[in-house]
């Protein structure tokens, strides 16, 4: 796809981070995607990128846990999970981001409380191949049986840690594909690119077709992103955080603790018992969980 062909198509709408979250979510529901410029402040992205430098050095490309399913993965991609335990910026600043929660409050109003289903960093290196176009609800197959007009139970956010350009594989997005009938095949020429600056975020409906593009071998940039999947608390997280050391959890805010499953949640009525409880009581009270306790851990 050439740049000229890309420009001739309707593009992903862009808004600044101070825009009304109700409008932002309305665009997601109508178009399937929206770009929020400055979703994460520059200083937050800088610190997070610094922490990922450490993770990246200890991570080999092409290594992905395949205990559940065997599939080929490119050696030019690194996957970095367990961000709550290993990245202070993720647990203290990203999980408390005001724009994130404003958007979640709008999106999940029909469902009640929400939490983090997945938080994962990725790094794509020169020569990384084109990613197959897909949507992000494959982790929870039950979602495919929802009515098309059902309130959104989940959405995805791709935040640029480094710049996204055409030559380093900026994400391809097919606007309107979230309204397609099940089984409709995507074509590459239907996609537009999500060019992003560090800190910009691409917010997508759960059914929107998208995929990374090829990273030119002669472009020596390493493209990094943060993929966060937010969902109603009625869905089990893709990645559990029960293994995060308690002192780390207790250094976090109550809101961030709820995001990683260390507090009970409250869906809307008809649920009258809460979820993630102990003997029908609040988890955090039963385990005497503290919060905002300083943790003596060095940053980067």
From Swiss-Prot:
SUPFAM superfamilies xref list: Clavaminate synthase-like
Claim: Hydrolase is one of the keywords in the record: no
Superkingdom, natural source: Eukaryota
Catalytic activity: okaramine A + 2-oxoglutarate + AH2 + O2 = 12-deshydroxyl okaramine E + succinate + A + CO2 + H2O; 12-deshydroxyl okaramine E + 2-oxoglutarate + O2 = okaramine E + succinate + CO2; okaramine A + 2-oxoglutarate + O2 = okaramine E + succinate + CO2
GO biological process: biosynthetic process
Pathway(s) where this gene product acts: Alkaloid biosynthesis; Secondary metabolite biosynthesis; terpenoid biosynthesis
Residues reported in the UniProt entry to bind Fe cation: 134, 136, 210
Named cofactor requirement(s): Fe cation
UniProt KW keywords: Dioxygenase, Iron, Metal-binding, Oxidoreductase
Null mutant phenotype: Abolishes the production of okaramine B and leads to the accumulation of okaramines A and H.
Residues forming coiled coils: none
Any one GO molecular-function label of the UniProt entry: metal ion binding
Protein EC: 1.14.20.-
Biological role: Iron/alpha-ketoglutarate-dependent dioxygenase; part of the gene cluster that mediates the biosynthesis of okaramine B, a prenylated indole alkaloid that possesses an unusual octacyclic ring system, including a four-membered azetidine ring and an eight-membered azocine ring, and that exhibits insecticidal activity against silkworm larvae. Within the pathway, okaE forms the unusual 2-dimethyl-3-methyl-azetidine ring to yield 12-deshydroxyl okaramine E from okaramine A. OkaE also catalyzes the hydroxylation of 12-deshydroxyl okaramine E to produce okaramine E.
Record-stated family: Belongs to the PhyH family.
Subunit structure: Homodimer.
Record's protein name: Iron/alpha-ketoglutarate-dependent dioxygenase okaE
Gene symbol of the encoding locus: okaE
